[in-house]
A protein has these predicted regions:
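Helical anchoring/docking segments at protein termini
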Residues: 1-47, 199-232
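Amphipathic alpha-helical repeat scaffolds of TPR domains
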Residues: 11-24, 45-72, 94-111, 129-151, ...
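Helix-turn-helix repeat elements of alpha-solenoid scaffolds
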Residues: 27-41, 72-85, 109-115, 163-167
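Tetratricopeptide repeat
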Residues: 35, 121, 170-173
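Short, composition-biased local secondary-structure segments
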Residues: 84-92
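Canonical positions in the second alpha-helix
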Residues: 90-91, 120-124
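A short acidic, amphipathic alpha-helical/loop segment
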Residues: 116-121, 135
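Long, ordered, amphipathic alpha-helical scaffolds
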Residues: 150-232
């Protein structure tokens, strides 16, 4: 995907928002202090718009975020806190059946309740909510990674029941992914963690130390086993 500033600055509709255009232009040039002054002026202006105008801006901006990389260059704290969060929260209250504000809040904004927003987007939008679906799966895969990232030191940081349930939920979500290659990649990752969990359960029934050696002797093909084994 293309850098977000490149996508925004070449967009025809940017001229509708001259102060936001100035912010992006200055940001692209690396003039952070000056860019934030323009952003502050833009936020003050946008707060005066009616809800419809604010929602139109949000639709335009988040659509660009969905097809861009490095969105942190534009989605800076003042823009999120002072404009986008309040805007989306009002939108959810005024039109609770629209999945878009839930999707954007869960995918892009800083919140402890990301999963709840994404589940709401899926509930309302169904299979059309592919970005919400993929984001949820990524969150689950990151949680599984955390559970196992010290496993070579005989340290499992997860809960067996919780991770078993997480794997099942993730497979259910992945069955709704439309892109076949993405679904295949996710399945491979989920199979990896499922095998690892199964082996850890089997290992702990036999012993408490030496999981790497146990995997080596069992012929398990985890990428970290041989590397760790040879280093020793």
């Amino acid at each position: 995907m293309v850098n977000v500033l490149t996508n925004i600055l070449k967009n025809d509709r940017l001229d509708v928002y001259p102060l936001f255009k100035k912010f992006c232009s200055l940001k692209e040039k690396g003039l952070r202090k000056e860019s934030f002054k323009s952003l502050s002026s833009f936020i003050d202006e946008a707060k005066m718009w009616d809800d419809n105008a604010q929602q139109n801006f949000a639709c335009w901006l988040f659509a660009l975020f969905e097809t861009s990389d490095d969105i942190h260059h534009v989605l800076v704290h003042p823009l999120e806190k002072e404009l986008l969060k309040p805007l989306l929260e009002r939108w959810m209250k005024s039109n609770p059946e629209d999945p878009r504000p839930y999707r954007w809040y869960g995918v892009f904004l800083n919140t402890e309740n990301r999963v709840d927003y994404l589940h709401n987007a899926l509930r309302l939008g169904g299979s059309k909510e592919q970005l919400s679906l993929l984001t949820l799966i990524d969150i689950n895969l990151n949680a599984l990674w955390y559970s196992f990232h010290h496993i070579s030191e005989d340290l499992y940081l997860g809960d067996i029941k919780e991770d078993t349930a997480l794997l099942a939920k993730s497979r259910e979500l992945n069955n709704k992914v439309e892109c076949q290659q993405t679904r295949k990649n996710n399945n491979e990752a989920l199979n990896y963690y499922q095998d690892l969990l199964n082996d850890w359960v089997m290992f702990t029934k036999e012993q408490s130390k030496g999981f790497v050696e146990w995997c080596e002797h069992k012929g398990r093909n985890y990428y970290w086993v041989k590397a760790y084994y040879y280093e020793k």
